[in-house]
Amino acid sequence: MSKNKKMSLSGGDTTEKFIYKPKDLIWAKMKGFTPWPGMIVEPPLDLLTQQRRANTKCVFFFGSRNFAWIEENNIKPFEGPWKEELAKVSKPAAFRHAMADIDKYIDDPAEVDDQINESCGVPNHATEADFDKIRDAVDSDENAVDADADANNGVVVHVVGSPDVSEAVEGENNADSSASPTVTAATPATAKSPAKRTPKAKPVSAVSATKAAKASTTKSAQKRRISAHQTPTGANTSGLPNAKRGKRVVSGGATPGNFDGASSSSPTARRRVEVDDLLASLAAKRAPNAIALLDRPVVTRPETQAIDMNSRSNTLADRDIVPSELTFGFLGLGMMGSTIVKDLIYTGHKVVVWNRTIDKCQPFVEAGAEVKDTPMDVVEAADIIFCCVSDPKGAKDLVFGNCGVLQLKDLRNKAYVEMSTVDPDTSLDIGEGIKQCNGRYLEAQIHGSRQEAADGMLIILAGGDRTVFEECHSCFKTIAKNTFFLGNVGNACKVNLILQTIQAVSLVGLAEALALADRFSISLNDIIDIFDLTSMKSPLLLAKGKEMAKGDFNPQQPLSHMQRDLRLVLNMAENLDQSMPVTSITNEVFKHTKRLGYSEHDSSAVFVRSRF
């Protein structure tokens, strides 16, 4: 790597001049990602066919081990005063894995080099050399043909053969192997029509076979005429997929036995054989569709954060919570459910759990919870059953589905609390089903992020049976800082979806504003610092803005959940003929971000769509 060309990396304050060559270790900035450790390499064959901008380099990314074209102004050398700063920009597991991967490469580059060669189909460094070899071969072949024409007084030797004729001759003259249905002609290099020569005498059987074959194959014989300087030896000379090659004899002494190998007196044909073999080997190894699919830049899934049963919230420890004597069932141990159950166990509540993936129940069993095989079993064992799943369909399946809550026909002395984010109609349907089985129903919508749940700082919006609300007081005090009872079933769902709409629209506005600042090359951190001093600030927007600036989209509130809430809001507004144009556009922005691969990332990942 030598200093000569100007280079800059987004987010950096210094610029230096560098020229990069293969095997140089670098930092590369790709759209939607923080600077990532990589290496300059020769492009794989499939990348050579892709359109790319000027002043780009092919970069191999450590960790994910894929390839991409990166502009030189988004590249920095790996070693430098900026290394320590860039290494601290992102902390996800994928980034740590990439750093470990490049350190491993520095110690032992063999394994990564082998993978690069395998991904490319042929060694990367040979790609340009192979192309030059093919180009030089074509040029030398043309020069050789011109030289041969000059040496023969302007006459180029042609080989003319009919596969059908040669097969007929071979069938009649197996005993006489010297018989060959070959016609030799000569063509002046500058003439339009071939010059005529007196043909050599042929055996009688060969002549009769030739006449019989020509009656039906005149056109195909004409199509099969080839010149030695036009078609590589061994190619399909008929121009048809299933045509067979006949034996050919070249005037000058070449026989059918040594023609394919190219006689020592024909360097042009021999060179053509080498080029043909090289092209065939490249085509066989390339597998372009598979390589293009595997080497596309991808969005990695966010790291699944395992529940830490030993962590304790300081806020929760300061609260004076007296656990209820009732047994609480919990259906669903997802991102929010697992955090809530952990806090309930910590505060001394008796909990029975169920989850579709039984492995997620194991940490809670070790902490003192009891696990059941089906939702119906949980209902039998518990007094009050909480449900917290990802969407309305899942919530209804747990109630009305096979082995669901309503499979236990008599829910007398049982209560069901729906904590999943659902629309009012779904909540009413579930409540009606519970009441028909003599049970009590409460909707308790939770508003907040995963971190707020861990800190016990959620907002609970409840509606339905007031007695159930009071019996759940100790649970709500454990997980929430404020609890509101809003009356009839459906009211809490409406309020929760309205709050989610405000949050989603605000996030899209923040993302677009920061994307504009980025286009102006204004530091996003400076924008966030100034925003913190204004009356517009809020803990939510400040936190999301910092995540956008860092490119850290570890899920606190998944983007797919936010888009789900917007969909429910728009359906609810449609039933009322309420116009919501801004919310509709916001929903489309979130849908597009999901399409880009950020469905399971945090809702702040909407910044990626606005920026790029």
Swiss-Prot record:
One of its GO terms (molecular function) is NAD binding. This is Cytokine-like nuclear factor N-PAC. It is found in: Chromosome. Keywords: Chromosome, DNA-binding. Transmembrane segments: none annotated. Its main location: nucleus. Residues 276-279 are annotated as: Interaction with histone H3. Disulfide bonds: none annotated. Residues 228-240 have a biased composition (Polar residues). The keyword DNA-binding applies. Residues 168-270 are annotated as: Disordered. Nucleosome-destabilizing factor that is recruited to genes during transcriptional activation and colocalizes with a subset of trimethylated 'Lys-36' histone H3 (H3K36me3)-enriched regions. Binds DNA (in vitro). Facilitates Pol II transcription through nucleosomes. Facilitates male-specific lethal (MSL) histone acetyltransferase complex targeting to active genes on the X chromosome. Stimulates the acetylation of 'Lys-56' of nucleosomal histone H3 (H3K56ac) by nej. Residues 177-193, 201-220 have a biased composition (Low complexity). NAD(+) binds at residues 329-343, 421, 564. The PWWP domain is a H3 reader and strongly binds DNA. In the dehydrogenase domain, the conserved NAD(P)H-binding sites and sequence similarity to plant dehydrogenases suggest that this protein may have oxidoreductase activity. However, since the active site is not conserved, the dehydrogenase domain seems to serve as a catalytically inert oligomerization module. Residues 22-81 form the PWWP domain. The lineage of its organism: Eukaryota, Metazoa, Ecdysozoa, Arthropoda, Hexapoda. Binds to mononucleosomes. Interacts with male-specific lethal (MSL) histone acetyltransferase complex at least composed of mof, msl-1, msl-2 and msl-3. Belongs to the HIBADH-related family. NP60 subfamily. Residues 319-612 are annotated as: Dehydrogenase domain. GO terms for biological process: transcription elongation-coupled chromatin remodeling. One of its GO terms (cellular component) is chromatin. The keyword DNA-binding applies. It holds the Pfam family NAD_binding_2.
